[in-house]
Each structure stands twice: as C-alpha cells, then as structure tokens.
C-alpha cells in the first residue's frame, strides 16, 4: 500500500480533456480546452491530461480525426496553467517516442504509457525515454478486468521494472465492481514496491465509477482519475465533482474546491455533450459485456448505418473479446450480425 487515506493527500488527475474527447468525437475547440483547463487549475486539480482520446497521435481514420492537433490542444492548455501538472497519454504503436519528445518540449511533465493489460512489455522503451526526459511516468494497464488479479499484478511489475513510478488499474470497460478493484490492488501490494504509487482509472458504465475509486483509495491508490460531469468514453469516467464531494464528506484530503468543480461541470462541460454522458441502454451494455468504452460512438454509427441495435454490436464485441485498437472490427461485426439476420429471414417459412 502506497497511500494512507487517513493522513495522505489524494492526487487528483483530471481526464476531461483526453478521455472526454471520446464523448464528443475529439471535437473540443481551443477556447473550450482553455476555459476547462483554467477552471480545473483554479479548482486545485493536481494534473490535467490533454490529448486525442486515443492518446498522442491518435487522430486517424480508425480512431477519428480531431478538431485540432494534439499540439494545438497542449499549447492552449500550457498557456493557462499556473499550478496543475500538464499531463498526456501515449499508447505505444499509436504514439511514438518522437511525439513524446515533442510533448515534453511543449511543457508536458507527466505521461501515462498505456497498453492492453497483457502487453506491458511494449511499454519498456517509452517508459525509459520518458524517465530520461525527467518526466513523471505512470503505467496504464487498460481493460484491467480481462485478466485475473495476479496476472495483472505481474504486468504491473514489468512496468515498475521499466521505471514507472505509478501503475494504474484501468477499468476501460467499466466492468469491474468493488470486489474486483480490491482484489487487483491487493495483488499489486503482493508484488510492487511500497514506494511505487498505485492509481485508479474508472468508467461509470455500471454506475460504479465513484464507488470503485473510493475502494481503490482505501486499498492504497493515491492517484485517482476523474472528469468533469463524467466526460469520457461510454457512460463516462468517475464524475470528478461527485467523487470529490463524496471523499470530502469522508474527511479525506483532496485539495480541490468542490463548488468550483460543480460549476465547471455544469457550465463548461455538460453543454458540450452532443450525446448525454450517462448510463443508458448502450453504455450499460458496455459494462455488462466488458467492452472498451470508446467503442460506443463507433458502434452507434455502425448500428445507424446498417439498421441494427447498437447493443447487439456491443454484446458481440464482448463475446469476441475485442480490445482497444480494434475499432476497425466494429463494422465487420455489424455486417456479420446483419448477414445472420438476413439469412434467418430467408429461410423462415
């Protein structure tokens, strides 16, 4: 355990301007990111993550193009921060060490190197170079529900051995419950050094984002991810203003202005949501099936294009154990479902 909720301060990491990109198809304007970053900075958030939803260099036909480049978003946020640490996310194979160096030159001082939960070995080069640049580095094990706690802990151990100063349980599918979160951090404790920090990245697809984050902190996770109004993929992340209000009632040290976060969520972020970020039929299907949360908007488009129920697509993606990076398979799955339905109609008496 690297954190004691009774005496230590939580490290609040906002992901509104990175994970939140998924919720609006990476369409934040420069004025939006400036205003949101300024509000977060003034509210006392420790770190603010900025990038395309799929991390540095994520803009592509597969993942979706953004309204601006990573560099334009990062420069805009760097201009307004006075205390919060400018952070970004990099997925090896999407982002390269060249993007990492460029982000550092723009003022990024902390990076999360993200891999699928069974592929920590591909993070070695990027973690090492980030450490050489003097950056704060976290390992980010996505879709952490897909493997058993002990196996996840061994992947975390690899990231620690490469130089990660913190390793996350990353519930990308919003499929973990409190018992699953607890078991994973207990497994981390059995193999990681006490000085290696733990972090929690929750999604709200089963309405457990805040509860899971509280349990994570009770199990020693000092770094907690959250976003204003839950702005994130699927049903969103743990809503920042809700999480902070909940832990404030418990007397925990979070360092944030609760009312300022409420105002930012309501006035700056919620009006941007062209699709409400909430638990509904489709986002609940994500958590129920254990599907990567950023598949939501892609699956909804495929459902509209081919006259299907988005839930059918999401459940099938779960059956096939599709993971982040396989967005191109969503249309294939939709076509398979459509062909099966047409075949059944053709043989019906």
Swiss-Prot record:
Active site annotation, chain numbering: 22
| EC category | lyase
Keyword Manganese in annotation: yes
Q: Which organism is it from?
A: Rhizorhabdus wittichii (strain DSM 6014 / CCUG 31198 / JCM 15750 / NBRC 105917 / EY 4224 / RW1)
Residues given in the record as substrate binding sites: 18-19, 172, 201, 292
Q: Summarize where Mn(2+) binds, as residue positions.
A: 19, 201, 203
Put simply, this protein is called: 4-hydroxy-2-oxovalerate aldolase 1
- What does the similarity note say? Belongs to the 4-hydroxy-2-oxovalerate aldolase family.
Keyword set for this entry? Aromatic hydrocarbons catabolism, Lyase, Manganese, Metal-binding
Alphabetically, the GO molecular function entries are: 2-isopropylmalate synthase activity; 4-hydroxy-2-oxovalerate aldolase activity; manganese ion binding
Q: PANTHER family of this UniProt entry? A: 2-ISOPROPYLMALATE SYNTHASE 1, CHLOROPLASTIC-RELATED (PTHR10277:SF9), HOMOCITRATE SYNTHASE-RELATED (PTHR10277)
């Amino acid at each position: 355990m690297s954190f004691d909720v009774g005496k230590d301060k939580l490290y609040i990491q906002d992901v509104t301007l990175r994970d939140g990109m998924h919720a609006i198809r990476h369409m934040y304007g420069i004025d939006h990111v400036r205003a949101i970053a300024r509000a977060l900075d003034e509210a006392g958030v420790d770190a603010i993550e900025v990038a395309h939803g799929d991390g540095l260099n994520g803009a592509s036909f597969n993942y979706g193009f953004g309204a601006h480049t990573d560099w334009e978003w990062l420069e805009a946020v760097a201009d307004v921060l006075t205390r919060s640490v400018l952070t970004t996310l990099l997925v090896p194979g999407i982002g390269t060490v060249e993007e990492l160096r460029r982000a550092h030159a723009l003022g990024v001082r902390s990076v999360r190197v993200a891999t699928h939960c069974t592929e920590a070995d591909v993070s070695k080069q990027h973690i090492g170079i980030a450490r050489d640049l003097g950056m704060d580095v976290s390992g980010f094990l996505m879709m952490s529900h897909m493997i058993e706690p002990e196996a996840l802990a061994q992947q975390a151990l690899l990231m620690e051995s490469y130089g990660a100063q913190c390793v996350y349980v990353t519930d990308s599918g919003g499929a973990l419950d409190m018992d699953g979160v607890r078991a994973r951090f207990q497994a981390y404790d059995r193999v990681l050094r006490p000085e290696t920090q733990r972090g929690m990245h929750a999604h709200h697809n089963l309405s457990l984002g805040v509860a899971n984050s509280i349990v994570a902190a009770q199990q020693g996770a000092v770094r907690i991810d959250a976003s204003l109004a839950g702005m994130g993929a699927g049903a969103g992340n743990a809503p920042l203003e809700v999480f902070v209000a909940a832990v404030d009632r418990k007397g925990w040290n979070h360092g944030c202005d609760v009312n300022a976060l409420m105002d930012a969520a309501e006035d700056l972020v919620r009006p941007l949501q062209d699709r409400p970020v909430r638990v509904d039929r489709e986002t609940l299907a994500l958590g129920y099936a254990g599907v990567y949360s950023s598949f939501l908007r892609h699956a909804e488009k495929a459902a509209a294009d081919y006259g299907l129920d988005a839930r059918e697509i999401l459940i099938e993606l779960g059956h096939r154990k599709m993971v982040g990076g396989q967005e191109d398979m969503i249309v294939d799955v939709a076509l398979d479902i459509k062909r099966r339905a047409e075949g059944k109609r053709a043989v019906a008496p």
